[in-house]
Curated annotation (Swiss-Prot):
Its EC number is 4.1.2.4. The keyword Ribosomal protein does not apply. GO terms for cellular component: cytoplasm. This is Deoxyribose-phosphate aldolase. The gene is deoC. The active site is at residues 89, 151, 180.
Length: 220
């Protein structure tokens, strides 16, 4: 198992500086992570920095509330891709989901999938705000809309990924859709627990610490 290729090396805090982004980019190249996940304003910088590497550029859309309209999310997606984004992590319309307005939730995700072309789309369901039934419904709608992944969390709400949520999401979507655990993996042990529960990608700001733990254990 190549643990490094499970990791989306992430820096999304609003106060992030260019120097901090450049540090994350250098680390991502050193460890050959799956991707770097940055806010849209840093996508062009990341794309230029990573152009000669295998590391993908991931960004966030409708972030962190998910409460923009489908048209705005679609525009954000196209803009991000034009700047060099390879992967799109979009926040679901959480309020519409909890209201039971599933048509809007579906339209919202479909708008981003359509705007993304052949780029990878991960749908952030913000599991900490949902009941288990709502988590299942969010995963089903994401699958129906043609997204590639479901993702647990933004990291900006009341909690991050849990092993139980990852397991439920994997059970719901089956083997043919990705599951990303985000906002909860701070150590090698955390990462392995999420992978064993069904995660195919891990979003973490502590990717280097996770890998250093893996090196200490000699198993990655």
């Amino acid at each position: 198992m190549k643990l490094n290729k499970y990791i989306d090396h992430t820096i999304l805090k609003p106060e992030t500086t260019q120097e901090q982004v450049e540090k994350i980019l250098a680390e991502a190249k050193e460890y050959d992570f799956a991707s770097v996940c940055v806010n849209p304003t840093w996508v062009a910088l990341a794309a230029e920095s990573l152009k000669d590497s295998d590391v993908k550029v991931c960004t966030v859309i409708g972030f962190p509330l998910g409460a923009n309209t489908p048209a705005v999310k679609a525009f954000e997606t196209k803009d991000a891709i034009s700047n060099g984004a390879d992967e799109i992590d979009v926040v679901i319309n959480i309020g519409a989901l909890k209201t039971g307005n599933y048509d809007l939730v579906l339209e919202d995700i479909k708008a981003v999938v359509a705007a993304s072309g052949d780029k990878l789309v991960k749908v952030i369901i913000e599991a900490c705000l949902l009941t288990d039934d709502e988590k299942v419904k969010a995963c089903q709608l994401s699958q129906e809309a043609g997204a590639d992944y479901v993702k647990t969390s933004t990291g900006f709400s009341t909690g991050g990924a849990t092993v139980a949520d990852v397991a439920l999401m994997r059970k719901t979507v089956g083997p043919d859709m990705g599951v990303k655990a985000s906002g909860g993996a701070r150590s090698y042990e955390d990462a392995i627990a999420f992978i064993e529960a069904g995660a195919s990608r891990i979003g973490a700001s502590s990717g280097v610490a996770i890998m250093n733990g893996a090196q200490a254990d000699g198993d990655y």
